[in-house]
């Protein structure tokens, strides 16, 4: 089993003080220990499962910034490990705060079926109610079991009610697109069996792309009453665990109680032995983070560790290849110079090659060429000083196939061959020239290996792992591979043996998905169909196919072994299905590499590859990171971005997407003015450009518009929404015979604006409306870009609209026309936006839209060139404020921080006052109850005294009567 060098771990207080717990990472590096893969995974969970879900405060003192280069493996691991845990903490915190997006994640009641201890972990079997869908749980799900409802654990009172408008607000400006969105729930308790109860719920998602704020119906969260009395000691009693797998109608969960501080672990461990109901809540899934963590440790055993550390004394260690002549000739006619240079750069001796693909430069086309080149190029031998011979060096850089090893063995030991005549049987067989001929034979063998990569001629079969951060990016390349195919060594087109692996793939690529291919192979085997004689591997797999069913796992392995290209996401490349493949992969190609954190990029590198090609653009949007602290310490930086500090990427410079007037600013501002127009760009000039209000580039200045925050969340600009609609109506009015809906895309940085635009354009389903982040990688003929930001407060910032990478993505989506809607007064405080506004102003592309008349009256007049010239001249006269300096920005940030601190202080004070009011109310109720009890006691006492007095009086009267009678 592979052993990994790990940094030391210091123990934390637990139930047993003798236990050394994998919890907190020690700052001072001591002698490293060796960890197997299972120990790495245990280390990951021992850290996370000790967390207190009711107090997930960050630990900044454990973090350190990502550097450009690292001293050694320990320096590398101890930098990224705390940052990975911080991001995990932030994801868990967000999941707890906002809830899951669907009602399948609602808390339910469960009971313990069994408990066992395995390798310091507490393994618990939980059984659910019959009406609970246990298939909502998956391997590596993080769950919480608690004595009381999770909302009580997180700080709410049992009698507290909360409506949706209090608890759910639109996604804030700082929220990254793609992150979980806030949801609200309504929970009711229903009895299902004699011992087990569960809950049902309805979830409303304010951030649903098909709904606006007005669509959300107000509901109330009601916390079911607890069966166990709530006390300060048991209010937050809970454990965090991870689901191992489904288990006979329930789930098998792993907990780690030894590392938990305080008395919580002991109390829960005792209560687990009793037949009581536990609230079980699904929090999030840790599969990707677990794979990143394992890859972080395993990378120390990879061929790329020196490259990852980026030490100056490290030389290149990769293999060198050359393109076959016929294939090179074919590429010369179908690829431009920058694309061809990128292809040849991947064949150089660099272990990792960087290819930068700005928008519209044919990045996917280059990836297809890369696959053709890397599958069919021949290996160029390295000549190093001090070596014994050429074969020794080739053997170091390449693993020989079994056939090649057998040929070498036969050459070196021919007497083991049955047909070899023994020398003692015939002395005439003595060959005194054997040594010389043997040397010649070896030289010929290695020459053939050098020229073809195989002793049998032709190229050895190489295997490529093709990855991207998202399913959409993977499916885009796979669909192009299916449609366009590849080129072989002779420059002829062919369809490669391609397999798409992993869940979430698009229906367009189903024909090459692993599950589909396995089903087809099973049907073929079970139908007793004739086996094609050309497929020896299939014949071997179907020997004895008289059985009605086949081993799915074996068929899956067979399909993967036959594949030339395996395509999957970065995360799924760490699944056991691929990590256990025999032989691994020779080459890894990662698309959109600049959109992945470095730890994600490490996952596919585990497969023993000799070469990695990273394709991406660090000038566009980075990976989505939840933790602001992790971003502060550069955890969101991609491996591509860090490596380019030392190694300049090969940039594609010819763009085929944007009209030259649209391309001009992004090229100058983001790409050092290196982008050139392809031969097709003149065709981007269309007939509707005769109306200059339709582009190619127009900035409509709504300097009087204002933004609002419905519910205090995401930003919304009503005036820009109306402007977008009236511009679309103007298109259809001027050109009534044309379908513009399918050619227009409307984008905005803010989700609430997107929701409002979708509501306005709901009768035009052909129009694509999305966030800037959601539109990355896509394009439309016409793009309307709503900037939204127009804060009322003077000096206020423009939020994440100031991110220059988001700005780049927005400006590079259109082919023919880009219409920008924005408030120049608000945007010009930012340096980058100020330059764009100045650019449009200098080129007579800035059109002021006044508020003297309603938009529905002004915009229909935007049809004549004379009016455009008149308005653009007014636009040139607009005084654009200077952007804020760095000092002013920092000062504003400090003011914002102070403002937030004051708001937090006021909220805290208000919360304390509310708590005091609640306490006073409870005290009054208690006093009233006590007074009532005292009054009752006093009244009872008086009644008793009166009764006693009457009894005494009656007794005296009776005694007097008796005495008289005696007389």
Curated annotation (Swiss-Prot):
Compositionally skewed regions (Basic residues) per UniProt: 900-909
Keyword Coiled coil: yes
UniProt keyword annotations, A-Z: ATP-binding, Coiled coil, Helicase, Hydrolase, Nucleotide-binding, Nucleus
UniProt cross-references to InterPro entries, sorted A to Z: DNA2/NAM7-like (IPR045055), DNA2/NAM7-like_C (IPR041679), DNA2/NAM7_AAA_11 (IPR041677), P-loop_NTPase (IPR027417), SF1_C_Upf1 (IPR047187)
Gene3D superfamilies in UniProt: P-loop containing nucleotide triphosphate hydrolases
Protein name: Probable helicase DDB_G0274399
Any Pfam family: AAA_11
GO BP, sorted A to Z: termination of RNA polymerase II transcription
Binding positions for ATP per the UniProt entry: 357-364
Residue ranges of the region described as Disordered: 161-192, 529-553, 892-967
Coiled coil region boundaries: 890-949
Record-linked CDD domains: DEXXQc_SETX, SF1_C_Upf1
Chief site of localization: nucleus
Protein family (similarity comment): Belongs to the DNA2/NAM7 helicase family.
CC terms in the record's Gene Ontology section: nuclear body
Cell compartments where the protein resides: Nucleus
UniProt GO molecular function: ATP binding; helicase activity; hydrolase activity; RNA binding; transcription termination site sequence-specific DNA binding
Biased composition (Low complexity): 928-937
Organism for this UniProt entry: Dictyostelium discoideum (Social amoeba)
Record-listed E.C. numbers: 3.6.4.-
Superkingdom of the source species: Eukaryota
Statement: the UniProt record of this protein carries the keyword Flavoprotein: no
Alphabetical list of PANTHER family matching this protein: DNA2/NAM7 HELICASE FAMILY, HELICASE SENATAXIN ISOFORM X1-RELATED
